Amino acid sequence: MRVVILGSGVVGVTSAWYLAKEGHDVTVIDRQDGPAQETSAGNAGQISPGYAAPWAAPGVPLKAIKWMFQRHAPLAIRLDGSSLQLRWMWQMLRNCDTSHYMVNKSRMVRLAEYSRDCLKDLRAATGIQYEGRQGGTLQLFRTEQQFDNAAKDIAVLDDAGVPYSLLTAEQLATVEPALAKVAHKLTGGLRLPNDETGDCKLFTERLAKMAEQAGVKFIFNRSVDKLLVEGDQIAGVLCGDDIIKADAYVVAFGAYSTALLAGLVSIPVYPLKGYSLTIPITDPASAPFSTVLDETYKIAITRFDDRIRVGGMAEIVGFNTQLAPARRETLEMVVRDLYPHGGDISQAVFWSGLRPMTPDGTPIVGRTPLKNLYLNTGHGTLGWTMACGSGQLLADIIQGRRPAIVADDLSVARYRTGFQPLNIAPLHDIHPIR
């Protein structure tokens, strides 16, 4: 079968890889000059199924108001009056109750755990190298309330079968030695030993080369103007003066998927702007061993081979990708506070990207009402975490094979009035880990 994939970020390239392994004739189209040039280029580097959770959570609306007056707030909103932004924010607000949160988190953890397993299998089969580490993740708490809330909320990890350990401030240095010097600033941490890290851009570039060797064709520097429809299916992709035809089409366009699908399939995917710094390491012993997540500022600090990646924050500002100096100050403040001697911040590379976020936090993977059109988008801040599982899942669906995990509630059909998912045991009715 001929399959066209629109988008060459980590989600598009993993989709191409798994479809090619099934024997399909795959073509990937992207406006950039190579893979992983946008959202996949500078993310925080975490592969963290245990922390997979929607931003739409109980308490977030009130926190958002409080954050408006904080210099280093993890979330910022700039209203532009567009119907897309207002509608998406309203949909997100409707998901900020406990019942919605638990359903959404259950979906996300299910896919994220599966995706990590798929990544392990891919790594074993190909030997792909991407500065990956399997050293777990560590969520850091600065207040007693954060620590106490985590102690109450770990039942969500028990339900998902995720191993964890709750550490006191004195125990943090056993997994992150450099934190010994700043333990007095912290109250403890939650460690997830099965989580991983790695350079998403490097992984995507190298997997794209492997996919090309497996027969995948990549068309770069080509804008995608329109999906052409005939009857109940896609007839081709209009790229300038050319029409590219296939038997099946996959939209993996990230935050730009919504506009491309306008008038064909309605999806609530909106850009959530994030930032990162990439810092050269000057003292390996003073740098992170794996990765930490500062719970107060929602910022991750991740170790690559000879670099530190500091990433996080969220801005609801439309498609604005301008670099905000105030956001750089926040990233620098956090890394200086926790790892003051790890790297040369004066040599840091500052980056911003647009994560494709759904209001319920769960990506959209699977079929659409158009019989040969498939979606793999809306992964938000977890594209790297969920990419391999989403790619394998999509390949199974296109292949007509039953997926290894329940997937009906991951498709766009879940937004349809009256949608009833398969019977899945919910997570405990508890407060979210935030």
Curated annotation (Swiss-Prot):
It is an enzyme of class 1 (oxidoreductase). The keyword Oxidoreductase applies. It holds the Pfam family DAO. Gene3D superfamilies: D-Amino Acid Oxidase, subunit A, domain 2, FAD/NAD(P)-binding domain. GO terms for biological process: D-alanine catabolic process. The keyword Transmembrane helix does not apply. NCBIfam families: PRK00711.1. Belongs to the DadA oxidoreductase family. This is D-amino acid dehydrogenase. It comes from Yersinia pseudotuberculosis serotype O:3 (strain YPIII). The lineage of its organism: Bacteria, Pseudomonadati, Pseudomonadota, Gammaproteobacteria, Enterobacterales. The gene is dadA.
